[in-house]
Each structure stands twice: as structure tokens, then as C-alpha cells.
Amino acid sequence: MSTDSIGTGREDYLAMLEESGGRNRIAGYARSLGQEVDADAVHRSKSEFFRTALAGSGLTPRPGVVDTIAAAKRDGARVGLVTTTSPGNIASLLDALGPDIRREDFDVVVDAATVSAPKPDAAAYTYALDALGEEPAGCVAIEDNGAGVSAAAAAGVPCVAFPGANTAGHRYDGARSVVDRLDPAELLPRR
């Protein structure tokens, strides 16, 4: 079956985002339709499309993100980017967000090449905590999806859910709050 054989509408796509791990998500969706696909090839095509779409998108940071990173750095906090997407997707995203948000803003970047298990597994957060030399209770995670909130909780990191347009319908059990913008005064632990 070709990589373009699975057609999905927006509602199907949003439902698929409940599960982390693009390849797993694609394979699971195909199985639910009684189809067999080369999930790796479909995922590669999707990622190439994503990167191309980001390149000239004029993407801007979500409300409060730049201020929160700046306040954390100003207060001497270490900042991590903890995801289980591919390094290529992260590079494309940071290129699109630059110069407002740059890779250099983060003391550690965890991605799919760093850990083998996607969220909701705690591995990405455990790795970040070790790399930063931090205890979970002294940190705060900001997550935009249910699997990310579950991963932070599994690692013992308090989490604030910050849903985006594609994840507004997720369940955020375990989040200490759900917000539509980041406010450094409410998020950052006092140092």
C-alpha cells in the first residue's frame, strides 16, 4: 500500500494525537481501518511535509512562552525541552521560532534519539532530570498533550497543561492546572 492510502479528516487526526509516537499512531490507525501500511514511510512523508510547512510559516511562540523562558533563565533556573519527537522536527520547529526561541535557550534537549520510549513513559523526563541535576519536586513541566502530562507525573514532576489547538480535547488528569497562556509568576518556583 502506498504512503498516501490512508485518508484522514481533522477529527480522525485529532483523535490520533491522543497517542504519542508518530509511527505507532499511524500503524494503529491503519489497523483500526483494517489496512496495512508502511508506517515508517508514512511517518517520513508526514515529517517532511511538517518541516516544509514550518519553513515559511511565520510561526510565532504561544502566549507567555518567551517570557517564561526568559524569566526562568534570569532567575537562574535550568530549562529543558523534553519531547519524544525527532531531532529533525525539533530543528525545524526551532528554526521557525527563531530568533524568539533558540536551541541555546535550553540547557538540555531530549528527543526521540535520546530515549527509546515515547511519552507517556517517564524516560524523557528521567533523562532530563539527570542531565539537569534536578529533583522532580523542584521543577515544573509544561505539556500540551495528555501523554506528556502522564509522562511528567510518572517522573514525579509537577505539570501544567498548556493545550494547543490540536490537543484542546485531551484529558489532562494529573496536571496541577490547565492554562491558555503561560505566566512566569505562577509557574516558576521561587529560588
Q: Where are the model-predicted features located?
A:
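N-terminal helical cap/lid subdomain that shapes the substrate entry/recognition surface
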Residues: M1-P63, A70-D75
